[in-house]
Amino acid sequence: MSTDELTLFSYEILGLVGRDGAGAHDLLRMARQGRVLAWAGESQYYTEPKRLASHGYLAARTEPGKTRARTVYTLTERGREALAEYARTPVRITPIKSDALLRLLICDLVGEPVTRDALVSLREDIADVRQRLVESERRAEALPHREKYLRLTLAHLHGLLDLHEQLVARAEDELTS
């Protein structure tokens, strides 16, 4: 990857910075709130904004923080143009990273009972993520300029959780215990 290339994660950072700007810690917090969308390593939420700023997609300024100065990033015209250009490209399904699907891949090697038990344990995680989505729905009200789009996203994520619940139910029915 060239140092000027924008990745899916780059666009995520530009989108999270949004209209009002954000520090790296804010970006990580926003990504973690829903948990399902925090797919990058923690350090990337600190290094990618710096990289984007060095290439002119973000502007960086220092502000007083709770314990020390913090860097706040805002979109530049180049960053807005990059988002506008990206928005015009066709949407593709990105590769899916799924622990549940990996368990099914190795089921013939490790056995159905252990795979079934592992998949059934997913219910607790589904409940946790679903609760986070409900909290995100409440937070969406505080962002009127994004509320409509956040609600579409959250509805999609609820659907993904529904699919996980269906997978767990099928595993319970079809795999031996």
Predicted regions: what they are:
Residues 175-177:
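Long amphipathic alpha-helical coiled-coil segments
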Residues 1-95:
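Basic helix-turn-helix/winged-helix DNA-binding cores
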Residues 29, 54, 135-138, 170:
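Regular, well-ordered alpha-helical segments
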Residues 134-154:
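Acidic interhelical loop/turn segments
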Residues 84-131:
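Amphipathic alpha-helical dimerization/coiled-coil segments
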Residues 24, 52, 126, 158-168:
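Alpha-helical transition-metal enzyme core signature, strongest for iron centers
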